[in-house]
Every structure is written in C-alpha cells, then in structure tokens.
C-alpha cells in the first residue's frame, strides 16, 4: 500500500457522506479522489454542503464517471437496496482484486438472506458477497475486519446496543432473555431526503416512538447478541425520534444473573474496554449525555443499579453520524488497511 490511498465516496450528498468528507479531509493517509451523487452530478461539493466549502474537493460525479483504476478504497453511503449490484460489479470487475469496501447501508449486515428479505422486502441480489461480508463492529470484530475486502458498517442503534451488551453476555453476567432497549435518536438518523416526518414542525417540541416492534435494527441487534451467547436471543427494542440533530441514547434494562449487580457489570465493561480508544465506561453515578460525544467517534457507557433488586440499567450514548455511521466506517478502514485505528478520528466532542 502506498503512502496515501485514493478514496471514493458513493452517495456523498447525504449526511453520512458529508461526515465522511469532513473526517477524511483531515486523515493524513487519505486522498479524496471521487465523490458521487448521481442527482447532483456536475455540482461543486461546496454548493451542497457550504460548511465544507474551504476544502479542495473533486466535483460531484456519477458512479459511472469514476476512474476505478485509480481508487483503492470505497465508502458506499447509498440507501439500502441500491448497493448490492453496485458493490458486486466493483468487487467482481477488473479492479475488484485491489478494492476494499466499507458499506454503510444495511445491505450486507444481516447474514441470513431470508432474514434480509423478510425485513427489507426484497430478495438479496448478491448472496455470495453477503456470505463474505464482515460485520464492522470494530471493537468486537477487529481481527476479521483486518482481512476483509467488504465490511458492513453497523447501524446506529445496533452499535449503541451491542457495545455494552456483548461483553456482558459473553461473561454470563446478564439474562439473555430479559433485555429491553429503549433508544432515542436525533433527526439526522432519518437521512437528508425530504420527508414530512422530518420537517421542523413535525419534530420540534415533541418526542415519539416509531417502528414500534417492527424496526429493522431489531434483527441486526439480535444477530450480534445471539452470536455472543451461541443461541438465539430476542430483545424488546423501541426507537424514538428526538428534537435534536445528532446523538443516540440507548437505555437498556437488564436482569443480572445470580451473584452479579451493577458493580460487577461496570467492572466487566471497564475491563472489556480498558484498552479501547473510543469506548469509555463512566464512573458510578454518572449518566452519559449525548452532548458529550457530539461530533466525535466516542461512546460513553454508564451502569446504574435499579431500585428493584437484581435489575440493572445501562445507558450508552454515541453520535449517530460518527460512531453510529461514518466514524466507525473510517475506523474499519483503518483496520482493513493496517493504519493506526484512531487516524483521522481523534477530534474531541463539540461542546456546548
């Protein structure tokens, strides 16, 4: 691998695309060589995202116009259902032997094609690649990510749920049949396309649950937790939309196994993430806040004793656009290419 890698971002006109550009622009080993947005092809990136107007960036283009012979790494930030054929063509094409890809859509997260079809409403069109794709929860799957050519970047809610839960399940500290995840996200999680439910007057000054019992991140969470314990795990998961731009707070209600409590759970999480750059377990009595991770790749986890004996409440916060999407994708890229994992991701949270 040369000193710098040429990167293409597919779907650069969305929020996750803009975050990829913002973060990669300061990555010392990356050259942004191609930015695609088919509906905005020919426009300057600054006309779409003026806050990044000071950067020297390529003009937005179509995917077909990219010189793939010059690209080393691809971030795919396109909607689910659109990436399977595109990624298949890239990896099976003349330059597929050298390309590495991080896909931010849901298309390669679920390992079972029938589960994907059930939740996303259509058959998977790249089943062989689906089998090959590595789930990119970096702190959990680092070794497999390092050798992958296709990584499926986890969803925002699944990241905030699995990071605290997987170490606890692996250690046998919680009952896998008694997990309730109450998650709240900022409006950017709905994407940048015009939708009535994302309008200011629809979101501001209120909060509501959505996808109750039917959200597509439920099976993604269950897949990861089931792998952690070696048997099927079902969770109760309900997301809520908050009147803020960024951030996710997952409040997770648990039943500790015999002999365990909030203290042993906190100790286990602290030990599991002691050497991790981006995951921090906060001290007893501290409740993490979304404003404390805004704009960063950090995750904060709090562990609290419930008033009901034997029950524990875990809270986890992240920026849904960074660790919940683009930041974790870059973290995966760093691992895939053998770069220091924190490269380009060491910025501190924005506050206030």
Curated annotation (Swiss-Prot):
Pathway: Amino-acid biosynthesis; L-arginine biosynthesis; N(2)-acetyl-L-ornithine from L-glutamate: step 3/4. One of its GO terms (molecular function) is NAD binding. One of its GO terms (biological process) is L-arginine biosynthetic process. InterPro entries: AGPR_AS (IPR023013), AGPR_type-1 (IPR000706), NAD(P)-bd_dom_sf (IPR036291), NAGSA_dehydrogenase (IPR050085), Semialdehyde_DH_NAD-bd (IPR000534). The active site is at residue 156. The keyword NADP applies. This is N-acetyl-gamma-glutamyl-phosphate reductase. It comes from Rhodospirillum rubrum (strain ATCC 11170 / ATH 1.1.1 / DSM 467 / LMG 4362 / NCIMB 8255 / S1). The lineage of its organism: Bacteria, Pseudomonadati, Pseudomonadota, Alphaproteobacteria, Rhodospirillales.
């Amino acid at each position: 691998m040369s000193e710098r890698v040429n990167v293409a971002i597919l779907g650069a006109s969305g929020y996750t695309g803009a975050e990829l550009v913002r973060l990669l622009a300061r990555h010392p080993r990356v050259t942004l060589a191609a930015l695609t947005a088919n509906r905005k092809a020919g426009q300057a990136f600054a006309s779409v995202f003026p806050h990044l107007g000071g950067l020297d960036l390529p003009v937005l283009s179509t995917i077909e116009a990219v010189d793939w012979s010059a690209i080393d790494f691809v971030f795919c930030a396109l909607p689910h259902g659109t990436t399977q054929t595109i990624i298949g063509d890239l990896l099976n094409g003349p330059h597929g032997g050298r390309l590495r890809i991080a896909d931010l859509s849901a298309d390669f997260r679920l390992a079972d094609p029938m589960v994907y079809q059930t939740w996303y409403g259509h058959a998977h069109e790249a089943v062989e690649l689906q089998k090959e794709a590595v789930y990119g929860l970096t702190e959990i799957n680092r070794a497999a990510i390092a050798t992958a050519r296709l990584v499926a970047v986890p969803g925002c809610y699944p990241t905030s749920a699995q990071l605290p839960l997987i170490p606890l399940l692996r250690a046998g500290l919680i009952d896998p049949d008694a997990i309730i995840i109450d998650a709240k996200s900022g409006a950017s999680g709905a994407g940048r396309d015009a939708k009535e439910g994302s309008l200011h007057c629809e979101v501001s000054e209120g909060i509501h649950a959505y996808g109750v019992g039917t959200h597509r991140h439920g099976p993604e969470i269950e897949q990861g937790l089931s792998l952690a314990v070696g048997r099927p795990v079902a969770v109760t998961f309900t997301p809520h939309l908050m009147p803020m731009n960024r951030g996710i707070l997952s409040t997770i209600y648990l039943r500790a196994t015999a002999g365990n409590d909030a203290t042993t759970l906190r100790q286990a999480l602290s030990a599991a993430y002691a050497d991790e750059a981006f995951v921090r377990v906060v001290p007893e009595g501290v409740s993490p806040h979304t404003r404390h991770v805004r704009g960063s790749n950090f995750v904060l986890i709090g562990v609290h004793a419930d008033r009901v004996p034997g029950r524990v409440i875990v809270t986890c916060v992240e920026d849904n656009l960074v660790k919940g999407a683009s930041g974790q994708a870059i973290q995966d890229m760093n691992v895939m290419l053998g770069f220091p994992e924190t490269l380009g991701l060491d910025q501190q949270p924005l506050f206030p």
